Amino acid sequence: MKRAFALLMALTMAAGLLAGCGSGSSTPAASSAAPAAPAASEAAPASEPAGQPAGGADKIVCGVVLIDMTNQFFVDMIEGGNKAAEDYGCEVIWKSADGNFDNQISLIENFIEQGVDCILVDPLDSEGLKPVIEKASAAGIPTITMAGQVDVETNYPTVYNDEENTRIIAEMTAKMIGEEGKTALLYGNKGNLVSDLRQKGYYAGMEKYPNITVVEQPTNWDPPTGMKAAQDLIAANPDLKAIHCISDAVTLAAYQAVKTAGKEGEIIVTSYDGNDDALKAVESGQFTSTVLTGAKKTGYWNIQVALQLASGVRPAEKILNLDTHFVMTDENKAKFAEMGIEGTEDVSVINPAQALERAAGYRDELYDPDLLAG
């Protein structure tokens, strides 16, 4: 179709994405990952009510259920989603599950009762959500599981290339610590697809290095929990050489534990998501690297997807993907290139200044005035 559709066609060949939706309503929050609007699509089945085009007499209403609304990634996602809501004239209701799966179920059920046009959710437990996603489908409401694959016909997962990216991070870390020693992994929670894939990728990368031991702790995506986990791991493992956290907000907290322990420069810190503070930490040398997913871009893109679903457009691809970029200083980029890690020949590696520019330009990149023109 138009520019956004063409862009997504290219992006779906690249990596992974998550999801989000726009403006208005009670609490601001965020979500997971996203590229440009979905690829060429087909009309929704007649049995599914299709919402009105954005800006029409009946404004499209999207309901979004986030894991929480305090993590900086989610905060930025909300901002991006609200910008899309402004651009396309839709309404978005943001709700937080506060890290509680039962809350997440209840919030989705409330959106079904309200009769919103599309529901987006960042699943705490993808498999556990299937019954309520099926309930939404039966009510004629399309859904987007951001970073979660739920096998329901009218559900569209949005994901990043998390497993492969984190495998590369693990191998880079292994090379930097001399292929021996002890590293720590701070993950989110079991059952969350993003957390599970990033955890799986890290172990896949470390499998090649039998002289490296990985210790781990869950964080539930919560920075204070992440700081405590890092403190405990550093205390229990004085020979720790590296820490990888699967979300920047948690990594920034964990870095404070490294600093307090007097281990700056001794413990390599790597991260994921690419929020502004993390990009500054890469520039200053506090972090060795992060991965730019672009939370604001993710939020904006997911709104576009939700608007198309609500208006009866179905993406050609069942699982939607968003591009990502490794972020490191030019000096570390040169070292990374010399490591010869398998699968990195075509990986995008940019410096923090380039990442900030990309992150700020998401609206110009994605906005399509003909998004719903058919």
Tell where the protein language model's regions lie, with residue ranges.
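Sec-dependent signal peptide recognition
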Residues: 2-10
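Hydrophobic membrane-targeting alpha-helices
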Residues: 4, 16-21
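Hydrophobic core
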Residues: 9, 13-17
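A residue-level marker of the well-folded mature domains of exported/periplasmic proteins
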Residues: 13, 21-374
